[in-house]
Amino acid sequence: MAADTHQRGAAKTARNPVKIDLEQSGQLLRKPSWIRVRSSNSQKYLEVKRLLRENRLHTVCEEASCPNIGECFGRGTATFMILGDLCTRRCPFCDVAHGRPHAPDPDEPMHLANSIAVLKLNYVVITSVDRDDLRDGGAQHFADCIRAIRTQSPQTRIEILVPDFRGRLEVALEKLSACPPDVMNHNLETVPRLYKQCRPGADYMHSLQLLKDFKAAFPHIPTKSGLMLGLGETDEEIIEVMRDLRAHQVDMLTVGQYLQPSKGHHPVMRYVSPEDFKTFERIATNLGFSHAACGPMVRSSYHADQQAHEAGIE
C-alpha cells in the first residue's frame, strides 16, 4: 500500500474480521427530527479553516466528518488531530481514512502551538489517529505538542484524546508523564460485545486499564471517556459500561448518537431519543461521574471546555 493511500468506507473495512452487512446498511433509518446539523459560513469558521491549511494541520472535525463542525469552528474552537490523517486501524464507524502513515512531522508541535496562539484559544483538544507503526504509539509526539503549546500559551488548558496504545501502554505512559495534559480522554466507543465488529484491533479491558493506569499515576488529573449509541448495543450494556468506567476511576463521560458517515460504514441500528439520553445522564450522575454530557449531538470533544469547567478545571 502506498504511503498516501486513503481508504474509506467499504474499501477500508473490507479486511475486517466481522463484515458489514451492506444490504442492511442500505436500508437507512430515517433521521428523526432531533438530529439537526448546523451549517456555518461565518467569518470565524472561514478563518479557522484558513489557518489550519496554512499550518498544514488536521482536525478530527474535518477528517471524521463531525456534524458539529460548523458550530465549533464558528465559535473558534477545534479538536486538532496530530500524527497525520491516515489511521492504522479500520473501525467501521469512523470516517478517518486508513492507510500506511508517513513519519511524524517534527515541525507539527510548533505549527500547532503557533495556530493556538494566533486563535487565542483558552481550551484545546488534541487527538490523533492510531499509530500502531510507532514504538510508543505516538505518545512522545503528544508530549511534544503539549510542551510546545504551554511554551507559547501557558494559560491554555489542554485535553488529549488518545488512542489505546495497545502493546505499548507502559512506554506510552512514561512518555506522557514528562508533560501530562490537564484532562486525559480515551473513548471506549461501544460495549465489549461489539468490539470485534466495531473496534477491530482494540481490546475493551486494555482501554479500561489505560484509563486506570493514567489515573493511578496522576490522581489529580481528570480522566474522561465517551460512548456512541446506535451500533447495536442495549441500554443495559451501556449502563454496565458506565459502571466499569467508574470502577476504573474515570471522572467524566460523554454519550452521543452514532451517525453513519456513508453506506460503506456500520449502519445505524437505532436512534436514541433526547429523553432517553437524559435518563443515561441521570444514571451517570448517580454512579458518581463528576460530569456527564449525554445527548444526540454530543461528541467527546464537543464543548469540551464547558465540560471541563463544570468539572472544576479553570
UniProtKB/Swiss-Prot annotation:
The gene is lipA. Disulfide bonds: none annotated. Its EC number is 2.8.1.8. This is Lipoyl synthase. Its cofactor is [4Fe-4S] cluster. It comes from Nitrosomonas europaea (strain ATCC 19718 / CIP 103999 / KCTC 2705 / NBRC 14298). PROSITE patterns: RADICAL_SAM (PS51918). One of its GO terms (molecular function) is metal ion binding. CDD domains: Radical_SAM. Pfam families: LIAS_N, Radical_SAM. Pathway: Protein modification; protein lipoylation via endogenous pathway; protein N(6)-(lipoyl)lysine from octanoyl-[acyl-carrier-protein]: step 2/2. Keywords: 4Fe-4S, Cytoplasm, Iron, Iron-sulfur, Metal-binding, S-adenosyl-L-methionine, Transferase. It is found in: Cytoplasm.
